[in-house]
Amino acid sequence: MPLKTSEPQYGKFGARLCAALAVAAVLACSTASHAQDEAKQKAGLSVWRSSGCSECHGAFANGEKERDEAPTGANLRQTRLDDATIAETIRCGRPGAGMPSFGADAYKERGCYGQPPGPAPDDLYPSALTLSAAQISDVVTYLRARIVGKRAVTPEECAWYYGEQASSNCDAPK
């Protein structure tokens, strides 16, 4: 007796429905991921502002410092550092270059730049502020998404940076 084969219970409509649901699930995950990334970018911007990063690097991280007496920070739009190196630079600072260390565990508890734990270098610029690993990660996310590899500041970028105060700050972004 031959085996009887039958059409799937829901036919072509069922297959299309399953495909549509699969696409919807992928889009929902993508949207949630985008929202989380956007939240980390905003958190990173908040840390960037509250930590005084723009004093040396400029509001848009282009090396145009905001205070004359501050050390001149690198133009992070042109950096070729990977995320791990950016994070280590924030955590450990740049001895001799004016970049302070923002990591509470830098040098003493956790070595920096391949060195074992020990005293901080004498030529490390002092910082009264420390950042958590999560805050440093948020700053790196912000820099990677909004700064690194970008050219001139666009009006949209300026508006995202300044938010509600954009109209008074974005007439001629740098």
Predicted regions and their residues:
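Short, non-ligating residues that shape and space the ligands of small metal-coordination modules
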Residues: 62-63
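Non-transmembrane alpha-helical segments in soluble domains
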Residues: 45, 87, 91, 137-144
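Flexible coil segments in periplasmic/lumen-exposed cytochrome c-class electron-transfer proteins
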Residues: 36-40, 50-51, 59, 97-174
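Bacterial N-terminal signal peptides
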Residues: 18-28
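Short, cysteine/histidine-rich loop/knuckle motifs that typically chelate Zn2+
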Residues: 55
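Sec/Tat signal peptide C-region and signal peptidase I cleavage site
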Residues: 31-35
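Short Fe-S-cluster ligation motifs
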Residues: 83-104
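N-terminal secretory signal peptides that target proteins for export/translocation
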Residues: 1-15
